[in-house]
Regions:
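Active-site cofactor/substrate anionic-group-binding motifs, chiefly glycine-
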Residues: 1-29
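General beta-strand structural signal in soluble alpha/beta enzymes
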Residues: 9-11, 36-42, 63-67, 92, ...
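Small-residue-enriched flexible segments
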Residues: 102-103, 108-151
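A glycine-rich phosphate/pyrophosphate-binding beta-strand-loop-alpha-helix module
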Residues: 25-66
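Phosphate/diphosphate-binding glycine-rich loops and adjacent basic-rich segments that engage nucleotide
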Residues: 71-123
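Catalytic-core signal marking the mid-to-C-terminal active-site face
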Residues: 153-184
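Glycine-rich phosphate/pyrophosphate-binding loops
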Residues: 60-72, 143-157
Length: 184
């Protein structure tokens, strides 16, 4: 289903990487006039969302992208696992060719770290110590946002837009020599 400001992609169980590759290519080939919401249903895993955000920002587009995964995070006080690590990536293009790309997962470790043997499954808890409720709240909010738009199964939601301004160069001047999100 596609309209000027909305697209729904059916992953049909495909790897999220492949689905997001096709979605990003589609947005770069036919960018929105202003903004577009893209919903991808039935695709998992999506991997590091900042990669896809950077591709869009390198193409001159603003992007906010989140995706769901199997429930791996419980409430910081204990109980059942209620949400995935549900990353959020935000990418802002820049006329200087160096976009800002923020990519955060809400778990102390990622599930990819567990699969790679770098971390243990019991380390999949909301990050933040005594403030872990904030990471849990964000993860749960993103889970429900995607669930509400996808309608069942795993998926991803992308907001992609043409920028109205170019804030990154001024930020880089103010930041001086500080490393910013997405810098190598």
């Amino acid at each position: 289903m596609a309209e000027a400001c909305y697209e729904r992609w059916e992953g049909r169980g495909a790897l999220g990487y492949l689905t997001l590759a096709a979605i990003c290519e589609g947005q770069l080939e036919d960018p929105p006039d202003a903004a577009r919401l893209v919903v991808a249903h039935d695709c998992f895993p999506t991997g590091m969302l900042g990669y896809w955000g950077r591709r869009l920002a390198d193409g001159g587009l603003v992007a906010a992208l989140t995706a769901t995964s199997p429930p791996r995070l419980g409430h910081p006080d204990g109980g059942p696992k209620l949400a995935g690590t549900n990353p959020l990536a935000i990418a802002i293009p820049s006329s200087d060719g160096k976009p800002i790309v923020s990519d955060v997962s809400w778990g102390r470790v990622t599930y990819g770290d567990v699969i790679a043997g770098i971390a243990r499954d019991d380390e999949l808890v909301p990050f933040g110590g005594e403030h872990a409720h904030k990471a849990f709240a964000m993860s749960l909010g993103l889970q429900l946002l995607v669930d509400a738009l996808v309608g069942g199964g795993y998926g991803a939601v992308l907001l992609v837009a043409r920028p109205e301004a170019d804030p990154v160069p001024a930020l880089r001047v103010r930041a001086s020599d500080v490393r910013l999100p997405g810098d190598a």
